[in-house]
Amino acid sequence: MVAILCGIRGGDNKNGESKLAGKSAFNSDFNFNLYEYFHFCSKMLKKEDTKPLSRGRSSNSPCMIVFCAFEQLSTLINAAKKHGFVNYIPLVFVKNYSPQVLKANMRIVGATEYALVLYRDRLPKFRNGCIQDENGKNIRGTGHMIFNWFNWEKDAKDIPKIHPAQKPVAVIKKLIEIFTDEGDVVIDPCCGSGSTLRAAAELGRSAFGFEIDRNFYNRAKNEMLVFEKDKQLSIFDFYKNA
C-alpha cells in the first residue's frame, strides 16, 4: 500500500513563504481524521505472513508508506502504533532544487521530502535483487544494499501535472519495486493525481485508489490513467457485466 499525505508548496510571498501559508490546501484539511484514516488502512492491508523464515530473509508481510512533512513524523508514528503499525523505517528523498526561492538569502532552504514505511510485527516484503538457490539460501553477490534515502526524480513531460502535492511516478515506482512483486496489489487511499496507480500498472501490479475530490478524480482518470493498459478488468467493467 502506498499512502500519500499531502503538504503545501512554498516560496512566493514577502516572507519567502507560500501565498497559501496558514491556509487550507484541500477541502479535507480541517476535517481529516487521522485515526479513522489509519483504521481504514489497517483493514485494507492483508494479514501478516506467519511462515517460518530463513536467516537473512524478509517475510511476505505488507507495509504502508506515508509521505508527510518532517514535523508530522512523530504524530504519524504515534497514531500508527495505536492501529497496530508498531514499527517504522524513515525515508528521505533528496532534491537538486528547492521551491523556497525567496528564502535563498535568508537561511538554509528545504530540498527534501519525507516518508515512513509502517509495518506491524514482521519486516515487510523486501526486494533488492537477491536470488536464492534451490535450497532457499541467498546466493552471494546477488542483491544490493538499499539506503534509506533516494534521489527525487522529476517526471518526464509526458506525465501530466494534476495535483499540487503530486509525487513523481518514477519515485513511486522505486518504492513499489522494493516492497512488492509483480501481480501484487497496491492501494492508494489518498489517490490525488493517480500517479501511484500509473506506477503500479506500468510495473505489472494491480492497483486501487480512493479520492474524495471529484475534480482530481476526473483529471486522474482522463489524463494520468490513459497509458497503454493490459486487459485487467476495471471496476466499471465489473458493474457493467454484473
Explain the meaning of each model-derived region.
Residues 71, 225-242:
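Class I S-adenosyl-L-methionine-dependent methyltransferase module
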Residues 220-221:
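Conserved SAM-binding loop
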